[in-house]
Amino acid sequence: MFIVKKLPVLNSQFILTYGDQICIAIVGLLSLLRLPEPLWGDQALFMVGGEAIRNGAVLYRDFWDVKPPGIFGVYASAGRLFGFNEIGMHGFDSIWMGALGLMLRLTLARYFTRSWIAILLPWMAVGLYLSVIQPNDQMQVETLVGLPIYTLIWCTWMAVQQPEKRSRWLFLSGVAGGIVLLFKLIFLPLMAGFWAIYLLHCLFKQRQSVGVAVGHLLVPLTLGMVMPIGPVMLYWTSQGMLGEIYDTLIKLPPRMVRELPSKPISEFVGTFVSWLKRSFPLLVLASLAGAKLWKRIDFLMMQMVVWLGLGLMVISVQTLSWWAYHFFLLLVPMAVLAGKGIDVALQSARPRWGRFVVLGSLLVLLILNVRAMAKTGYAMARSGLPTNPENLLAYQKRMSPLYPSLSEQVQWVNEPGRVPGPIYVIGNPTLYVLSRRTQAIAFLGWIPEMMLREQWGTIEKQLDQARPAYVYIERRHVKFIPPEFWPFVNRVYKPAQETPEGTWYALSQQPTG
């Protein structure tokens, strides 16, 4: 099995070192420069949904998406605290990721043989994240979930370190696990892997019987998971929505996998290779620990390896998507294993070679930091500080190659004299943000290639009831719209404005009855 390294729960004599200050400065500057980044695609969708929830909408009834509620809760909280705009969303993301970096720093302060390695962890994890993310990567489920997953692992690790307080730590691990499930149900096998390692420890290291070990594990875990999930279920019960929740979160995803075409395996390979390139410094450092871990592995490192292996499996089974940001699920274990790799390299029989690889990898990471700062700094220098709407939009156009096109697409609907009120977009939800309008119906129009045929009937019914003044259909999505949807569009709407990327339709009929 694995060894158990006895450590204090937290470093009770934590002192902010010069190294900490340097890492905080780098990560803080990167976070500050990321604040005005454009909201793109999913981010815009989540913010629109979060704002609707803040205004009283009920998720899955008044605003519908197939994702579990965790991500919408995060965006609703971010908007409530800091405002429903780019600064508010990315400010919350900076605090969240900063909390992850702080937790890595504090919990692993005495784990490595050289204490300064723990100082580097926030920089290696959060610094890399802020240096390589694209607009659609930031504040996604896979980037946010690293904090509760690591919390789950650390609490389970503490149950090993302090068996006399086992129930308390496993309860907290269950709380973290419940939060993880609110982000994505598909993370359940990943969580089960972490807890299975703990169960094996109880069976083979502590020589507990199967019944005792399972009971000691499941009771506090279950009670902990009820803490975040229970209130959400009670709320939906009060809204009479348990049937809708079951259909959306349990029945629908398998149907989508069965009935919709999967992406080619080449896309998975391509996004995986892209991730390896982006995380190259951590990959090199983590690989240095490989031989050592093969011979002798402790509980925490076992959990990190399980996170990588099962995390990659969780990503691979999501055959309808395979988006690049999915691989940020692997960021935290790669950073922790990179720290272990530094530790191993500096203890090797050839320390000079180890120092060369470590310094080279950290230098590459620093170059990525500087490149990201230079890119955003140059964009701000050309567009002006984003302290007013005009400069902000100019900056975003420079940072996202598609923002000029999106701005052009909403120009017509933003002209004076247009009918105010909600609109509906079959296309990029960033158009809601740029037009400063809300979504007219509950059902989203983002990524229509992932919609079942019957869902188009739901969209038609909701549009017929709401009759928003304008509907926009992006031209690239026309091929995914079933023929039976067009008679409704042509009967109720008329083409009003062509853009290079799509068509605005204006209401031609008023609701009957």
What kind of feature is each model-predicted range?
Residues 189, 313, 319-355:
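Hydrophobic/aromatic-rich transmembrane helices and adjacent perimembrane loops
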Residues 192, 196, 383, 393-449, ...:
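Short periplasmic/luminal acceptor-recognition loop of GT-C membrane glycosyltransferases, typified by
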Residues 28, 168-185, 191-196, 226-227, ...:
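Membrane-interface alpha helices of multi-pass inner-membrane proteins
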Residues 25, 91-112, 126-127, 151:
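Transmembrane-helix motifs of polytopic, lipid-linked glycan transferases
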Residues 102, 274-311, 338:
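Hydrophobic, aromatic-rich transmembrane alpha-helices
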Residues 104-128, 146-147, 163-168, 303:
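Transmembrane-helix signature of polytopic, membrane-embedded enzymes
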Residues 144-163, 169-172, 176-177, 198-199, ...:
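Specific aromatic-rich, kink-prone transmembrane helix
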Residues 152-172, 204-208, 282-301, 342:
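Membrane-interface transmembrane helices that cradle and orient dolichyl/undecaprenyl
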